Amino acid sequence: MLKSTKLKNTLLVGATAILVSCGGQKEIKMGSYAYDAQFLKDHGIEYTELVSADGNSKVMVIPAWQGRVMTTSASGDEGDSYGWINYRFINEGKVSSQFNPVGGEERFWLGPEG
C-alpha cells in the first residue's frame, strides 16, 4: 500500500512538473522578425524600429551600423524576416577594421571594402 501511494505521488509530481514546464513562454520561430529582434537584443545590439499603425509592417534599423536596415516584416513579429543576419559572425563577436559581414537587407557590394 505504501509503495502504491509513493508511486502515485511520484507520478503526480512528475506530471505536474511537465505541465508547468510546458506552460512557459511561447517559442519564437527561427526565420521570424521576432527571432531576429531577440537575437540582436541578446547580443546587446541596439536597434530602432519603424512600425506601421496596425503593427504589421516593421523595419529594423541599427544606427551604430551606419543606419543599416537589418530586416523587415509585413506580418508583424510572427511574420517572416526578409533580411539576412549572419548569426555565426555576430555570435563570434569579432570586429574587423575593414569588413564586418553582419548582414542586412538589400545590400549589394560591387567591389572590396576598405
Put a short name on every predicted segment:
Residues L11-V13, F39:
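Residues embedded in well-ordered secondary-structure elements
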Residues L2-L11:
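Bacterial N-terminal signal peptides that target proteins for export
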Residues V13-A15, G114:
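Enrichment for repetitive, rod-forming helical segments
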Residues A15-G23:
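Hydrophobic h-region of N-terminal signal peptides that target proteins for export
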Residues G23-G114:
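Surface-exposed acidic/polar loop and edge beta-strand patches at domain peripheries
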